[in-house]
Amino acid sequence: ADNRRPIWVMGHMVNSLAQIDEFVNLGANSIETDVSFDRNCQVLVVFDLKTGHRWQFGGITNKVLNEAAYK
């Protein structure tokens, strides 16, 4: 039996779609980001509790995020 586990190369604290592309191009096979959704499942913000920084992701839908996941 093959008991090997995958190695995760994670893009950490990704805060824009451009950064997603950047990390994927650098070899990341997973992305860590914080998102919030409104009642219509629209992405509202990315928020870093440690620094207090807040980024707006206006107009990005679940469809866009799902498409980014399958590039």
From Swiss-Prot:
Q: How is the cofactor bound?
A: Binds 1 Mg(2+) ion per subunit.
Q: Does the keyword Membrane apply?
A: no
User: Major place of localization?
Assistant: secreted
Q: Where is the active site?
A: 12
GO cellular component entries: extracellular region
Per the entry, which co-factors are needed?
Mg(2+)
Q: In which tissues is it expressed?
A: Expressed by the venom gland.
Is-annotated flag, keyword Magnesium? yes
Q: Which reaction(s) are listed as its catalytic activity?
A: an N-(acyl)-sphingosylphosphocholine = an N-(acyl)-sphingosyl-1,3-cyclic phosphate + choline; an N-(acyl)-sphingosylphosphoethanolamine = an N-(acyl)-sphingosyl-1,3-cyclic phosphate + ethanolamine; a 1-acyl-sn-glycero-3-phosphocholine = a 1-acyl-sn-glycero-2,3-cyclic phosphate + choline; a 1-acyl-sn-glycero-3-phosphoethanolamine = a 1-acyl-sn-glycero-2,3-cyclic phosphate + ethanolamine
- Which molecular function GO terms apply here? lyase activity; metal ion binding; phosphoric diester hydrolase activity; toxin activity
Q: Which domain of life is it from?
A: Eukaryota
Task: Identify its protein family.
Answer: Belongs to the arthropod phospholipase D family. Class II subfamily.
Q: What does this protein do?
A: Catalyzes the hydrolysis of sphingomyelin. May also act on other phosphatidyl esters.
In Swiss-Prot or TrEMBL terms, this protein is called Dermonecrotic toxin LgSicTox-alphaI-Loxn-A
